[in-house]
Amino acid sequence: MSDFEQLFAGKLPKLIMFDLDGTLVDSVPDLAVAVDTMLAELGRPTAGLESVRAWVGNGAPVLVRRALANNLDHSGVDEALAERGLDIFMRAYAEKHEFTVVYPGVRETLKWLQKMGVEMALITNKPERFVAPLLDEMKLGRFFRWIIGGDTMPQKKPDPAALFFVMKMAGVPASQSLFVGDSRSDVQAAKAAGVACVALSYGYNHGRPIAEENPAMVIDDLRRLIPGCLDLDAEILLPDIKRPSSRESIVVVTRKLWMKVIKALARWRWRA
């Protein structure tokens, strides 16, 4: 029995929400360059690739604080120093993404899902200002109907607010939705939203095997998600999906738009 058959009784979900860093793209090399630039400018030892790989996943402010602490525990970092470090990091990271790469199988799988009429959204903790340019550089933006950054809404993952928002906008219930990510925050957000979560084994989870977070399924290649995803004649039952005559506009959710719908989502507010 295939992965999707296990989760959705032989059908495709109507909506799939994806994380970005560590799920679709490996961005750690560029993040590490920006972190080391920040540390060097502050007169501190550089961190290096593997340390940064263990620190990413909770947004830029947390990454900067962890780098300043040289530890996952950043509770003792001075607030003024953290703000200064964040400004330097944001400036350095905005300059280029020359070392970021798309993981194998990602484009093929997204193309297949798009052909099958599955709605797709991107929900990331990466600051909003970096998301669209990176997607354009990687040629991934056209696959997503909704794109939400880490500072787009008042909450970020593991809070499930963004998942609830996308499901409401898509008109798709949690039972017909899937979240695909690579970290504890992704799994927790999906569980809190009542959505099945498939996790990638190759991503960023602070050095812990993602299986320890108990997602519904762990895979090592996105192409494993769908049987025959490279075979456009694969026989998979599809839900009743209204296919647009032409691809509808991508909706990049911004903070301004979010404030217009926050009241509608209030009843779903997650409480830890």
UniProtKB/Swiss-Prot annotation:
> Which terms are listed as keywords in the entry?
Carbohydrate metabolism, Hydrolase, Magnesium, Metal-binding
Q: Which GO terms describe its biological process?
A: carbohydrate metabolic process; DNA repair; glycolate biosynthetic process
Q: What's the cofactor?
A: Mg(2+)
Q: Which family does it belong to?
A: Belongs to the HAD-like hydrolase superfamily. CbbY/CbbZ/Gph/YieH family.
A GO CC term assigned to this protein in UniProt: cytosol
Q: Function of this protein? A: Specifically catalyzes the dephosphorylation of 2-phosphoglycolate. Is involved in the dissimilation of the intracellular 2-phosphoglycolate formed during the DNA repair of 3'-phosphoglycolate ends, a major class of DNA lesions induced by oxidative stress.
- What Pfam families does the database record attribute to this sequence? HAD_2
Q: In which pathway does it act?
A: Organic acid metabolism; glycolate biosynthesis; glycolate from 2-phosphoglycolate: step 1/1
Please tell me whether the keyword Metal-binding is annotated for this protein: yes
Q: Which InterPro entries match?
A: HAD-like_hydrolase_sf (IPR050155), HAD-like_sf (IPR036412), HAD-SF_hydro_IA (IPR006439), HAD_2 (IPR041492), HAD_sf (IPR023214), PGP-like_dom2 (IPR023198), PGPase_prok (IPR037512)
Q: What is this protein called?
A: Phosphoglycolate phosphatase
Q: Which PANTHER family match?
A: PHOSPHOGLYCOLATE PHOSPHATASE (PTHR43434:SF1)
Q: Which NCBIfam families match?
A: HAD-SF-IA-v1, HAD-SF-IA-v3, PGP_bact, PRK13222.1-2, PRK13223.1
Instruction: Please write the reaction equations for the catalytic activity of this protein.
Output: 2-phosphoglycolate + H2O = glycolate + phosphate
Q: Does the keyword Coiled coil apply?
A: no
Q: Which domain of life is it from?
A: Bacteria
- Catalytic residues in the record: D19 (nucleophile)
What molecular function does GO assign, one term?
A: phosphoglycolate phosphatase activity
In terms of HAMAP family, this protein maps to: GPH_hydrolase_bact (MF_00495)
Q: Where does Mg(2+) bind?
A: D19, D21, D182
The EC number(s) this enzyme carries: 3.1.3.18
